[in-house]
A protein has these predicted regions:
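Conserved short hydrophobic patches within well-ordered secondary structure
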Residues: 36, 68, 87, 110-111
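Catalytic core of nucleotide-sugar-dependent glycosyltransferases
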Residues: 68, 76-100
Length: 133
């Protein structure tokens, strides 16, 4: 994960910049950004996007704080048309907020489509061999 804001902002254009299970925040800042909204699968990424758009500063610690176990179900949940529609809606919101350009919106939608519509075993390989490097 990127540590500094200068790295977090460009990373957030295409991927969730924080590991939610390790996030600490000021409650009032979250409320000022609109709190968590109903945004299936992507509630945290939606909130971080709105907070970034409002100028809140983020920082990721370099230490690994949690080792999370995954199962095949994780890769199955992250696929399908409904998941893609939510990602497309998030990209639209990010574009409206000024976090991403039209080109980044299109690129993000294409990448999300590829990830969500591939078979689960390929999605697992992509996460393990490409996205977790």
């Amino acid at each position: 994960m990127p540590r500094l804001m200068e790295d977090i902002l460009p990373y957030a254009r295409y991927r969730n910049p924080l590991n939610h299970m390790t996030v600490m925040f000021r409650k009032q800042d979250v409320l000022n950004a609109g709190n968590y909204r109903h945004f299936p699968y992507l509630e945290d990424y939606d909130l971080w996007s709105r907070m970034l758009a409002k100028g809140y500063a983020f920082y990721n610690l370099p230490e690994i704080l949690v080792k999370a176990r995954t199962s095949e179900a994780l890769y199955e949940r992250r696929g399908g048309a409904a998941y893609f529609r939510q990602y497309r809606q998030l990209r639209k919101e990010q574009h409206t907020l000024g976090l991403i350009s039209g080109k980044e919106y299109a690129t993000g939608c294409i990448l999300s489509f590829g990830m969500t519509m591939q078979p689960s075993f390929l999605r697992k390989l992509t996460y393990q061999k490409v996205l977790r490097k």
